[in-house]
Design a protein with these regions (language model features):
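Soluble extracytoplasmic domains of inner/organellar membrane proteins
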Residues: 49, 64-160
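Low-complexity, Pro/Thr/Ser/Glu-rich flexible segments characteristic
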Residues: 15, 20, 24, 156-160
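Alpha-helical transmembrane signal-anchor/signal-peptide segments
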Residues: 1-14
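A ubiquitous short alpha-helical element
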Residues: 9-12, 44-45, 117
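TPR-repeat structural position
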Residues: 3, 16-20, 54-55, 91, ...
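Extracytoplasmic/periplasmic/luminal assembly and interaction segments
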Residues: 19-71
């Protein structure tokens, strides 16, 4: 696979390329629609801070999400998008991103609920935080660690 080769050449020999070349090649990989390498290229760009424009990052996430076929893999990318923007977006924008997870039976649902609960808790919106923490606890298939964290937060910080 040509794109696998390009990706590996870049990450194992970054000194051969300028930042602009790396960015352009990674975006080319994202546009290739090859799931594994599109994801890796996006995370590389973000990790190395090669894309500064938040709107461009949002668009790159959207491309990767739309090209990801596997349900849970797509949901993971959606969650990572929300996580990335959690300190940049308001609650409406975050909920827009996370609604596909919150309204599904995805394994990432409890993670999405936890992110929103912590978002509201950090913003002193304790009633909303409680609602999201309680949803995690009442979920049948919620992540065990997140359920414990939600219970701790409710008992320690949000009890009346």
């Amino acid at each position: 696979n040509k794109f696998a080769e390009v990706f590996n050449n870049i990450i194992f020999d970054t000194n051969k390329y300028s930042e602009i070349e790396i960015k352009d090649k990674m975006i080319e990989i994202i546009n290739s629609k090859i799931e594994t390498y599109s994801n890796l290229a996006l995370y590389y760009l973000i990790d190395k801070k090669l894309v500064k424009n938040q709107n461009e990052i949002k668009n790159l996430f959207d491309k990767v999400i739309s090209n990801t076929k596997d349900f849970e893999h797509k949901n993971l990318v959606i969650f990572k998008k929300a996580l990335y923007f959690s300190d940049k977006f308001n609650e409406i924008e975050l909920l827009e991103i996370l609604n596909p997870l919150i309204n599904s039976e995805s394994v990432w649902k409890s993670h999405a609920l936890y992110l929103m609960a912590e978002y509201f808790y950090a913003d002193n919106q304790n009633q909303k935080a409680k609602e999201f923490f309680n949803q995690i606890i009442s979920l049948e298939n919620s992540n065990i660690d997140l359920r414990l964290q939600a219970e701790k937060r409710l008992n320690r910080d949000l009890s009346e």
